[in-house]
A protein has these predicted regions:
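Strongly charged
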Residues: 1-94
Length: 94
């Protein structure tokens, strides 16, 4: 399902204009992105958590030149679904 399909679905279920739904969806994504950029996690009860994970520095190999390279410590965005959400997906796809 794409973002456009989500907007259409929400619009049809709520009766709210697509333009208004799009603004709300875009604002939600913007808040999540900005929070994570600032190192804050976002928790949505019953859905899941958008968390910032720290990746440690590690040594990797450049196989074309056969040299070792250092990948510095960095942060990556991650999503951890809520247990309720995981259970519904497990039982719903039969």
């Amino acid at each position: 399902m794409t973002k456009a399909e989500i907007i259409t679905e929400i619009s049809s279920k709520t009766g709210i204009e697509k333009v208004d739904v799009q603004e709300v969806v875009e604002a939600f994504f913007k808040v999540v992105k900005n929070s994570m950029i600032n190192g804050e996690n976002v928790y949505v009860r019953g859905f899941g958590s958008f968390v910032v994970k720290k990746r440690a520095e590690k040594t990797a190999r450049n196989i074309s030149k056969n040299t070792a390279i250092i990948i510095p410590e960095h942060f990556v965005p991650s999503f951890k679904p809520a247990k309720v959400f995981v259970e519904k997906v497990k039982t719903g796809n039969k």
